Regions:
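Small/polar glycine-rich anion-binding or flexible loop at a beta-alpha turn
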Residues: 228-236, 261
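Cysteine-dependent PTP/DSP-like catalytic domain, specifically the C-terminal lobe
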Residues: 253-271
Length: 271
């Protein structure tokens, strides 16, 4: 196996055997103090704030192309690089990096299944010395296919061939917790909190395909539909995006800004 054949969701033992491969870049989005304490050998650290933009009240937006080009070049990404991302929180930050790479036109990436939890708990090697990225030239080719905004979603409300999946907590979905001017959810959206896809009994891995489909199918989330995922800032829902991609869903989009955008716009409908 080489980097061209690495799967979308990679197991720790497979990554362990792949350490040192040419064109492999491992990116750690854990907290800085965690990274300095322990990380996958050779992994470079990336602060999550580098891959999101803010235009208050909207948070979690996609940065300008020039910003992404600068960040990914400094990180050491070029057209040949296969990025494996992980974090220490269950995969949300890592998944957001991979979704952002997709938006930037980069196709070669994997999510470490279980992240740092699985890597450490299953006895794989660790390093404490910070790795210095080797800068490369990243050629951004903007790809809007994985991206939805409020106008795009508004045009699809009520359509049978499109489903909205809210990855926030049930309390946020039902309007009992409010982190924007308005509470509730986008009309027609169904709710599956992002953590429901995580198997805490298997070191924070994704649940099996069968288990995930059993959660999704009753909600009307099936692979023949377009699915748009969102949360508060497209952090949690980035994990949901990767989960759906792993299941073979081909038409999936993430709403950058998510409820911090929709919930603060008085012109948009709310349930």
């Amino acid at each position: 196996m080489n980097t061209k054949t690495l799967p979308l969701v990679i197991e720790p033992d497979v990554l362990d055997k792949s350490l040192g491969y040419e064109n492999l870049l491992i990116v750690d989005l854990s907290r800085p103090e965690t990274y300095l304490k322990m990380h996958v050998p050779g992994a470079v650290h990336l602060d999550y704030s580098q891959i999101i933009a803010v235009s208050r009240p909207a948070m979690g937006l996609v940065p300008e192309d020039a910003t992404l080009t600068r960040v990914f070049s400094a990180l050491g990404v070029d057209e040949h690089t296969h990025v494996v991302a992980y974090d220490d929180e269950g995969g949300g930050r890592a998944a957001r990096l991979l979704w952002t790479l997709e938006v930037a036109g980069h196709k070669h990436y994997s999510l470490l299944n279980g992240g740092l939890h699985a890597w450490v708990n299953e006895g794989h090697p660790l390093e404490t010395t910070a790795a210095t990225p080797t800068a490369k030239t990243f050629q951004l080719r903007r790809n809007n296919a994985p991206l939805a905004d409020s106008a795009y979603i508004s045009d699809r409300l009520g359509r049978d061939d499109c489903r909205l999946l809210d990855a926030r907590s049930p309390d946020e979905y039902n309007g009992l917790k409010k982190y924007a001017e308005r509470a509730g959810h986008i009309p027609g959206a169904v709710n599956l909190e992002w953590t429901q896809a995580i198997d805490t009994g298997r070191n924070m891995r994704l649940k099996t395909d069968e288990e995930l489909n059993a959660l999704l199918s009753p909600l009307g989330i099936t692979a023949d539909k377009e699915v748009i995922v969102y949360c508060q800032t497209h952090h949690r829902s980035a994990h949901t995006y990767l989960m759906l991609r792993q299941l073979g869903f081909e038409n999936v989009k993430g709403y950058a800004g998510s409820w911090s955008d929709w919930g603060n716009n008085p012109d948009l409908p709310v349930e």
